[in-house]
């Protein structure tokens, strides 16, 4: 705060120079916490938050950072991956043009996100916090995402720190390939997907054959799958008629 009052206008928050024995903080949480601290000090408009992070890889992640106060985002890891893909021959063409294409994709994705909220300029989206937290405790919300709804509460700083520690430990495993995870695409023994290959294959079989037993197999897979969404926690009161 004293540096900003002295005339400095750029604050760079970076997770680039991480080391093996340190656990990096989540860039979104850090951005939100610093943003709200500057607001509380009455100097937020006197400084710009530059976020240099490997966390931001798609337009949604960039939108979240900007929505919680980032002035601009530099996704260094995404650019490093692009350079590596070009160098290894997996991505053809000029590396600079590949970066430009990636940036263009981010821009279009951001515009789509903004337009859904009726916003046409990034300055109107910055710090708007047009989000609702799912699964974050009050202590996290009050420090990092003040004013955001978190109806079901959830993970504490200790929980989130444990997750970060796992990621940090995996990042520094020697001679081990990077774990791609299963967030976007089904990967065996990774994150659960409600529409996994077993469910889809059984649905196709039931539709193509028209056999009731095949349909029952599909229905049993759907009805017995673990809780993966909030709506899966709801249950209809079928024993009480409303008539």
Model-based region annotation:
Residues 23-51, 101-108:
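Alpha-helix-loop-beta-strand connector modules within alpha/beta enzyme cores
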Residues 2-10, 16, 36-43:
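Conserved helix-loop functional segments at active or binding sites
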Residues 55-69:
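Catalytic cores of alpha/beta
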Residues 1-2, 7-10, 61-62, 72-77, ...:
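Flexible, glycine-rich loop/tail regions that form catalytic "lids" or insertion modules at the edges
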């Amino acid at each position: 705060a004293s540096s900003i009052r002295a005339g400095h206008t750029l604050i760079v928050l970076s997770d680039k120079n991480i080391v093996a024995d340190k656990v990096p903080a989540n860039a979104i949480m850090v951005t939100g916490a610093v943003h709200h601290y500057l607001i509380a000090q009455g100097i937020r408009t006197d400084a710009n938050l530059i976020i240099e992070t490997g966390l931001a890889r798609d337009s949604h992640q960039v939108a979240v950072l900007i929505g919680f106060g980032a002035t601009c985002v530099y996704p260094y890891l995404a650019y490093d991956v692009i350079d590596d893909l070009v160098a290894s021959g997996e991505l053809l063409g000029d590396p600079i043009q590949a970066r430009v294409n990636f940036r263009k994709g981010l821009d279009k994705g951001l515009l789509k996100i903004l337009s859904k909220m009726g916003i046409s300029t990034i300055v109107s989206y910055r710090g708007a916090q047009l989000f609702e937290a799912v699964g974050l405790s009050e202590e996290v919300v009050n420090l990092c995402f003040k004013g955001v709804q978190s109806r079901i509460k959830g993970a504490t700083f200790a929980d989130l720190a444990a997750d970060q520690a796992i990621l940090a430990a995996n990042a520094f495993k020697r001679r081990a390939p990077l774990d791609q995870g299963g967030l976007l695409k089904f990967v065996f023994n990774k994150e659960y997907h409600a529409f996994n290959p077993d469910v889809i294959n059984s649905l196709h079989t039931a539709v193509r054959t028209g056999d009731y037993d095949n349909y029952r197999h599909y229905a049993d897979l759907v009805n017995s799958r673990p809780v993966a969404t909030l709506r899966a926690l709801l249950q209809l009161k079928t024993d009480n008629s409303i008539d």
